[in-house]
C-alpha cells in the first residue's frame, strides 16, 4: 500500500487505552481505534483525551487508524 492510498481525517481523542491505543471520534461522527505513529512515539509526543489529531485510515479497514499529527 502506497502513501497515496491512505485516507486522512481529523478527529478528537475520547479515551486513552492501554498499549498506546486511543478511542478517536472523527469529524464525521464515526468512532475508531487509533495507534500512535513511529515519529510521534520516537519524539515522546504526549496525546491526551480532548486533543485534536490527524488520523490516517487504510482503505481496507476503516475502523482502525494511525495518529500522524497532534494539533496545538
UniProtKB/Swiss-Prot annotation:
UniProt keyword Magnesium, yes or no: no
Any one GO molecular-function label of the UniProt entry: ribosome binding
Entry's localization field: Cytoplasm
Cited InterPro entries: NA-bd_OB-fold, RNA-binding_domain_S1_IF1, TIF_IF1
Gene Ontology CC: cytosol
Domain S1-like: from-to ranges: 1-72
Classification via Gene3D superfamilies: Nucleic acid-binding proteins (2.40.50.140)
One Pfam family this sequence matches: eIF-1a
Taxonomic superkingdom: Bacteria
Keywords: Cytoplasm, Initiation factor, Protein biosynthesis, RNA-binding, rRNA-binding
UniProt family annotation: Belongs to the IF-1 family.
Subunit structure: Component of the 30S ribosomal translation pre-initiation complex which assembles on the 30S ribosome in the order IF-2 and IF-3, IF-1 and N-formylmethionyl-tRNA(fMet); mRNA recruitment can occur at any time during PIC assembly.
Function of the molecule: One of the essential components for the initiation of protein synthesis. Stabilizes the binding of IF-2 and IF-3 on the 30S subunit to which N-formylmethionyl-tRNA(fMet) subsequently binds. Helps modulate mRNA selection, yielding the 30S pre-initiation complex (PIC). Upon addition of the 50S ribosomal subunit IF-1, IF-2 and IF-3 are released leaving the mature 70S translation initiation complex.
The name this protein goes by in its record: Translation initiation factor IF-1
Species in which this protein is naturally found: Clostridium novyi (strain NT)
